[in-house]
């Protein structure tokens, strides 16, 4: 069940509970892709253009562009043009702190599950 304070705030903004859940699906669905996670982590180190991302991650141009567009639409990354290049950078206001929280949670819980699975204990 969704937090009533969050729901109250969303209703004030004109969102329904269903819209909020659909927005959650879009947000978390963006994080399901391993390629998008790799792009996010690469951009946490600094801005990059498509060619730099392709080279660093070994992903083809079409996939990089498609994933960057999804990340941009969902507010995970921002783009800026410098000369003839478009550079992408992480959304420092929201995504950087969120990734730090996620990593803290993963190091406390998920890594242990992953290691147990690899050892055949899970």
Name the predicted role of every residue range.
Residues 67:
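Residues within the DNA-recognition helix of helix-turn-helix
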Residues 19-63, 82-94:
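N-terminal helix-turn-helix DNA-binding core of bacterial DNA-binding proteins
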């Amino acid at each position: 069940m969704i937090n009533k304070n969050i729901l109250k705030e969303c209703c004030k903004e004109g969102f329904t509970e269903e819209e909020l859940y659909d927005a959650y699906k879009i947000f978390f669905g963006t994080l399901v892709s391993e390629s998008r996670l790799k792009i996010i982590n690469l951009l946490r180190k600094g801005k990059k253009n498509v060619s730099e991302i392709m080279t660093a991650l070994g992903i083809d141009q079409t996939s990089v562009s498609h994933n960057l567009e999804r990340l941009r639409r969902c507010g995970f990354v921002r783009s800026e043009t410098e000369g003839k290049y478009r550079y992408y950078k992480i959304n420092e206001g929201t995504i950087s702190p969120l990734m730090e929280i996620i990593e803290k949670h993963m190091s406390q819980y998920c890594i242990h599950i992953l290691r147990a699975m690899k050892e055949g204990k899970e």
